[in-house]
Structure formats: structure tokens, C-alpha cells
Amino acid sequence: MANQKFDLVALSELEARAKEHHFLKSFAKSVEILRGVLAMRLILQGDRHFQTINARSGLARSLRAIHQYDECFMLYSENIRIHTDKLGPDHPQTLRSLSRLANTYFAAGQYENARPMFVGILASRIKVLGRDHPDTPRSRSSLANTLSELGMYRESAVLHQEIIDDRVRVLGPDHPRTQLSRLRFEIVRKAIHSA
């Protein structure tokens, strides 16, 4: 038992080191470390333990940074399966895992796959978390950005305007997130006039 506790502490230290590598953009090193951490967590803690789930998510994040999307899809899908089974489909953690998968589809340029996921995530977050929870405007923004990539500029502009209105109300007109939303709205507005 003492060895297992030592192993778990060592794994946490390795994960912290992998996060540092990710932060420093040494993604390949982060992936290398996290593959080992995940393998050991699966052995010591099983696939459903929260630290195993976090290790799987961290590995997927670093893989996404080096465009290894297929493995990311698999890792995030496994976390979604486990979260849905343990917590239910509308639990905030399940929705966070779904969002990570949808964002990976977006990063991979698979906008048609990302779009229905973002629609569902947004609807669930409004229902579960409410319109003003920080995750909700992020979901609306992800959907708006996806629609823009699909050339659906008018639909995207409507969502971006909703985001601006919500962020002005909740965060204030000068908050960096509000300013970013205005910038995205202007980009979409110009695309509408150019089309």
C-alpha cells in the first residue's frame, strides 16, 4: 500500500511536469510523459477514477496541440462515456468533456461534426447552468465561430450579438471577453458585406 501511495504521488508530480512542458509548448515531451502517467493510472486506479480521467484529458489536450486529432477524439470520447455513465448527460463535467471534443473537431477543421455538438452543449448549458454562467457564453461563442467557418455569417452574427449583450450585462462593456466578442462580431459583419 505504501508503494502505491508513493506511485500516485510520483504520478501527480509527473503530471505537473507535463503541464509545464505543455505551457512551454514542448508538446511532444508532454505527450510522452502523459502517456506513461495514463498507463500507470489505468493500472493503479482504473479507467473511471477522476485522476485517470484528468490524465486522459491532459493527454488529449497535448495531442491536440500537435494535431494528433484521431487519438484526441478517442480519448475525449472515452471521458464522455464515463462521465455520462457516472454523472448523467447534462452534468457540467459531462458537458465540459463534450465541449472539449467539439473544440477538437473545430481545431481539426471538421466544422460539420462540431456544429451539432455545440448546438446540444449550448442548449444543455442554458438549461443546467443558466444563461449567465461563464461556460454558456463560451458555448454560444464556439457555435458562432463554427457557423462562421461554415459560411453562415448571418446566423453567426446573431449569436455574436447575443454574446456581446450578455457579456456587457454580466462582465461590463470594457471586460476583455466583451471586447473579444465585439471583435469577432466585426469580423463576421465584414464577412457578411463581402459575401
Regions found by a protein language model. Give the residues of each.
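Intrinsic-disorder-linked linear interaction elements in eukaryotic regulatory proteins
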Residues: 1-195
